[in-house]
Every structure is written in structure tokens, then in C-alpha cells.
Amino acid sequence: MADKKTVTPEEKKLAAEKHVDGLVQKALVALEEMRKLDQEQVDYIVAKASVAALDAHGELALHAFEETGRGVFEDKATKNLFACEHVVNNMRHTKTVGVIEEDDVTGLTLIAEPVGVVCGITPTTNPTSTAIFKSLISLKTRNPIVFAFHPSAQESSAHAAQIVRDAAIKAGAPENCVQWITEPSMEATSALMNHEGVATILATGGNAMVKAAYSCGKPALGVGAGNVPAYVEKSANIRQAAHDIVMSKSFDNGMVCASEQAVIIDKEIYDEFVAEFKSYHTYFVNKKEKALLEEFCFGVKANSKNCAGAKLNADIVGKPATWIAEQAGFTVPEGTNILAAECKEVGENEPLTREKLSPVIAVLKSESREDGITKARQMVEFNGLGHSAAIHTADEELTKEFGKAVKAIRVICNSPSTFGGIGDVYNAFLPSLTLGCGSYGRNSVGDNVSAINLLNIKKVGRRRNNMQWMKLPSKTYFERDSIQYLQKCRDVERVMIVTDHAMVELGFLDRIIEQLDLRRNKVVYQIFADVEPDPDITTVNRGTEIMRAFKPDTIIALGGGSPMDAAKVMWLFYEQPEVDFRDLVQKFMDIRKRAFKFPLLGKKTKFIAIPTTSGTGSEVTPFAVISDKANNRKYPIADYSLTPTVAIVDPALVLTVPGVVAADTGMDVLTHATEAYVSQMASDYTDGLALQAIKLVFENLESSVKNADFHSREKMHNASTIAGMAFANAFLGISHSMAHKIGAQFHTIHGRTNAILLPYVIRYNGTRPAKTATWPKYNYYRADEKYQDIARMLGLPASTPEEGVESYAKAVYELGERVGIQMNFKAQGIDEKEWKEHSRELAFLAYEDQCSPANPRLPMVDHMQEIIEDSYYGYKERPGRRK
């Protein structure tokens, strides 16, 4: 007789790999067939498969009970029912095929695709219900599944999978939609998890198995162990809490991972609760029996030197309380369903505070709420991180406090944790037999696993234009002597006027006070007249302190851009004293999505802006430019909360403005309008304003400077505000970015700086770039065409975009010269060497400026450095390098 051949480990491994490869290859074929199923077919398959499993739920429960010798037949039947009924009902209307969602407003379309072949790992604790659950969610998502069952539950698990498979195939699923390893082994399970054809691993089991799943280099939905505390606080419904915990802990002899492992009871209700607990056939072990129980369950006794290495005796899992007591060496009354052991603390010294997966529960007394929460937290952190924790209380706030304190994904309130954890019976958690523990438990999933976890959701994003806006002061008054509105403005009693010394000396401040004195009510006012050109943050802070002391209900900003800008930031600091200046100056791409959200203003005061120069447009804009002179920085601050409440545009206030100032501010108006017109955020609403402002400047600036007649001064004053309205909503570009930084470094006049730079910027933006700016509405580069539009409007040569760009740049330069501006920085008294030394730094700072993102061409630092260097000599001598 021949000797029986001995199979070597290598041969065993190769055989397992061959078997697994065959299963996976068939699953891959099934995957392609399942992709062809529509939603109606999928739902029909799931319905038929679930009904077949439901029909056999008792038979399967008995098979599992007889094969494993663990748990309670009736409870296993309930778990099978749960998998067939609650899980399927929850995902009944879930779309898992093709287009599952379409939103015309956001432009998003979601398309569901299967993840691929699923490796299903099942435990001995819930063999049939887990097989049913994983098969059904795989069928729902068109994923073939290949199981590796726990060896001790191979037959019953395969029985469950076969029933689901056969019903699914009969309903139209492909032949190999559900498969399993027929000869279980570690080698086969490892081969399945590591097979390149397997897309994801759905693992339920011990920590070692879950860790192995996560080590396979592919997506894994593995879940961790639980060590669930139930804290019974003194306000709890004692009868309900005792009932729930006994029902939960005894269910299937404690084999559900969400079952309570310890009950923590406030001292005030301890005796009453224990008595209620005992009435449900819970046996409290004495000191001697506790030691025997510890020795049998964990091989150590409390406070012994080997406690740290205690390991659960797997034989007790799912066994009856009477059997465990007998094996431990003591007897308990017939019908005992839970063994309770009073413990002094949570942790290694009390082995019974570990997870036990059996009808054995630790009982601890809490001295206070804080102590109860602490003990519950310690339980969760004692090898149960992320899983579940329960609390029984009538105090809603305590429930929230408990939820914040424990590192558990599921916090179950006033419910049995077994059913609370698996969901849908006592609460609105997703029904599942695979419970994720999140990062606390080193899991990739932090929720109850369901069909959604087995889908690849593809997103189709249709291009959409961002919603745009027109935000301006609620009221804008214009025409001569419109300052009389101050007589009629409502709710004006305490007025702070922010201005500068020039307004005092020219008598404009007196004219404002005169209007306030004509009101029917007596007005108290505070004057802050210390605003300097390019106001410094220290000036703003001084004004804010005065404002806080005075407590105005109205702020009037009187003057040019400097008083209005300073007053805006004082307004912000006054109403929102906690705001940090550094937060205000941060750059943004989209003002609505900025990292720092400006607070809303206007709750304490209204803001009335009265311009006395025709340049900044600050009376209608959300912008303020504040300097940090200690660091040679100038910061443009932008937010619509800074938009004035009321603007009064009275041309009578600009009649005495010196011609040189009118020239500088007028060219600033032209720059505002030009940059707003070509901005990537320009719209139909801002374009008309920008073009009208440009037209008014070319028609009236020269006369305004040289003749100072009322008509031209009025038109330029209107142009300033109209341009402000345009750039308040379309924003600016790199002419202002560079002007801010040059002005901060060399203290040049802002409008004049823009005048010198603007021809260069027109040529730069008017050249088709290699890198364009980012804004959805700006769907193609068109700055050159828009400059051509301006040139045509002005009657300049513009037969092509290129000609229009050159004509307009030249016209801007010549207008600057005609109004007396020396159109280069050399003439501004700046040293050439110093200018070149700072050119690179200024270009970097300009790139970071808030005005740069709206420029129609993505501004490159090298290019801005060239513009800065060329502009020293002026457009006529060095017109710039077209790039």
C-alpha cells in the first residue's frame, strides 16, 4: 500500500492561490455582466435574493447555531431577519446604477459605478447574517463578491451565500455573482485579499484579520473591535435602562460587537439599578467567583502581574452564562442569562473590563457625572476606540457632553447598544452588520457600512459661471448742494466726522456742521481731523479709540480717498473690536469665499461718505487702502461690509480743487474705469458704467484741470463715482497693484502713479498671453478687443484689436501730458539706482496685491518687474516690451 503523500506548505499555498485565482477570474467576468444591468433589474435581483434569505432565516439560524455551538438560535434568526429586512428596506430607493443625481443649478451630475470584485471576510459570531448582508449590498451595487468564511462557520455561511446566489441568478444576475472559498485556510484568505483582481476588502472579524485587510495595499472596509460602556446617570429611567442593557447584553449571548461590556452606574441609584438588574436573571458574582471567572475568561486574576497580557479565552464567545460559570468552577441558578462582576476601575488591572463577546458584564460605580464620563471614556480607549458607547439619562445636555468626551463613532442614547449600534431599530443609524470605527479605531470608514461604500461615484461637473453681483450704497445723492440731505437723514444724533486738516482750512467742515445744525433735533458731533495722505494704521487706531469713547450713531467721512478709507476701517474696528488687522489684508480669489469673513457692519452706526476730490470713488466702493508706514507697506482692503451706507456726490465741494490735484485724481478715475472694463470680473452691469466714465474723462478732464469750470468739474465728479461703481463690482488690475507698492516705497502720488503705469498695462494686457487668468465667466481672452471698443468709442484708429490697443495706450499717455503730468518716474525725483534695486521686490509685492487676481491676464512677476523698470523712463522713451 502506497504512503499517503504529504502536502508541503508551499504546495498548499499554490493550491490555495490557484483556487482563489479561478474564483476571481470568474468574478471579473461576472462584473462585466453586472455592469449591463439597469436599476430596475438590480432592484428586482436584490428583492428576490432578500426574500429567499428571509424565507430561510430560521433554517440558516439553526445551521449556524448547530455548526458553531455559539449564541442563541432565536437571536440568530432575528439577525438574519435584520439583514434581509432592515438593510434592504433602507437601500430600497437608493440609486446605484448610472446617473443617480443631477443638479441643474450646480451643474453636477453623479454617476454610480461598481467598485469591482469584493473580498468578503465574515466572522464566526454572525456567520449567516453577515454573509446575507454583504451579499445583498454587493448585489445592490453590481459588485461580484468572493467570500472567505470563518473556518468554524464555513458550512452555515456557505449555506446563506448559496441561497442568496441561487435566487439572484434566477432573477437575472450572472452565474458567479456570489462565490466563496470552498476549503478555508489562512493561505486562501490571504491569497484572496491580495489578489490583484480584487478591488476592495469588506472585512468583519478580529483585530488581526482587519489589520491584515488594511495591509493589502488596496481599499479596505475593515472595522475594529468594541469595548462598549453603558453609563447609567442618576436621572435615567432605571427600569428602562436595566431592561435595555439586559436585553442587549444577553442577545445572542453577547456576540454582537456593539453589546455592552460594562455598565457604569451613578452611586445615587446604584442599589436600585442593581436590584432591577437582578430581577432579569442577572447573577452578580462574589469575590471568589469573580476570581474564578477572571481566570477562566482571561487566564489572569485582577491586579495580578500578568494582567497586562491578558487574552480572551475564545471558548467563552457566545456561550451561555450557566456554561461559563460551570467551566469557571462555580454554579449559578438555572435560567441565569448574564454574569455581572463588580469592578473597582477600568483598565488592565480589571481584566473583566475588556471586550468579552459573551454574557459577562463588568459593573462599576461612578461617584459623579464627571467620574461616570471618565470611566466610559476609559472603557472606549481600552481596546475599543471608535466603536460605540451608550448613555442612559434624561439630561440632553449631558448626552452632548458625553458624546464630545468619548472617542466613539456611535453614541447610543437611552437604547440597548446592540440594536442601537447596528442601527434602524432604536435610532436612525444606517442598518448594518459592519460598523466602522473611523480614525479612532484605525478604520477607513467612520459609519455603519452600507451599499454606498461599495460604489465609485463619478462626478460630471458642467462649466458654470459664478453668480455675480452689483453691490452699492443703499442711497447715492448727487447734484449741486446735495449735502442738504444731512438735514433729513434719519436717526442722526451723535455724529463723528472723520476728515483732514485741509477740509478744516478750506471751510468744508463748517459747511457740513452747518447742515447738521439745521436739523430739527440737536446733533452732538466729534471731529477727528488728523487723517494724513495714505493714512497709516496708527492713525486709524487713534481714530477708533476716540470713536469708541464717543459712541456715534453716524459716521461722516469728508474729504478725498484718505479720510474715507481711514473712516471705513475705523468703522470696522469700532463695531467689531476683536478684528485683527492682519486678517483684513489677506488676499482672496473670490471675495465671497475668502478665508477671513468680514463681519457685517451698520448695527451701531451708519456711514455717510462725502467726497471732496474726483478720484478715488471710495464713497461707493467696498475698498480702503491703509498704509503700514513702519514697514513701507500699503494694503488695499476689500469687503462689501465696508461699502458706505450713503454717498453724497456734491460737485460744489470740488470747485476749488487745485488743477494739479484734479489732474492726478482724474487720471486715477480713468485707470479705475479702464481696469474695471477689461477686468475678468467685468459684466454687462459694470461695462456701461466704465465706458461712460472713460468718455466723461476724455471729454472733461483737460477743461477741469485748466479752466476749473463748474460743468467739467461736475462731470469729473460724476465720472469718479461712476467709475467707483464699476470697479466696486468688477475690481481692478495690476496698474493699481503696482501703484500701491510703488506709492508705499517711494511715497508717490497715487493718481499720478497710475497715470504713468496705465499705458504700459494697456499694452501688456492687450497682448495675447501664454497664461490667462482664472474666472469661469471669462471664457476667452478678450482684453485686446475691449481696448479696441474703448478706442472706437473715443474715435481713435482701431481697425484691429492690436491697433486699438496701441491707439488707446497712446491716447492715455497724451492725455496725461496735456493735463500737466510728467509721465515717468524719473521726473518724480526718484533715484534711478534705488528704483532698479527695488523693482524686483515691488513686482513680488504687486503680485500679492488684492487687485492682481482680477487682471485679465495672469500677472507674472518678471513681466511686472519689466513694466516697473521701463516706466522709470516713461512710455514715450521706453514704451515697454510686448510679451
Identify the function of each model-found stretch.
Residues 620-730:
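Carboxylate- and glycine-rich phosphate/diphosphate-binding segment that chelates Mg2+/Mn2+
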Residues 35, 330-466:
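Conserved C-terminal structural/oligomerization subdomain of aldehyde/semialdehyde dehydrogenase
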Residues 6-7, 13-14, 132, 210-347:
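ALDH superfamily catalytic-core signature
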Residues 91, 160, 538-652:
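Glycine/threonine-rich beta-strand-loop-alpha-helix active-site module
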Residues 745-748, 752-837, 877-878, 882:
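Gly/Pro-rich interdomain helix-loop hinge
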Residues 2-109, 137, 279:
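N-terminal Rossmann-like NAD(P)+-binding subdomain of aldehyde/semialdehyde dehydrogenases
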Residues 467-554, 825:
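ATP/NTP phosphate-donor binding region
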Residues 99-240:
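Rossmann-like NAD(P) dinucleotide-binding subdomain of oxidoreductase/dehydrogenase enzymes
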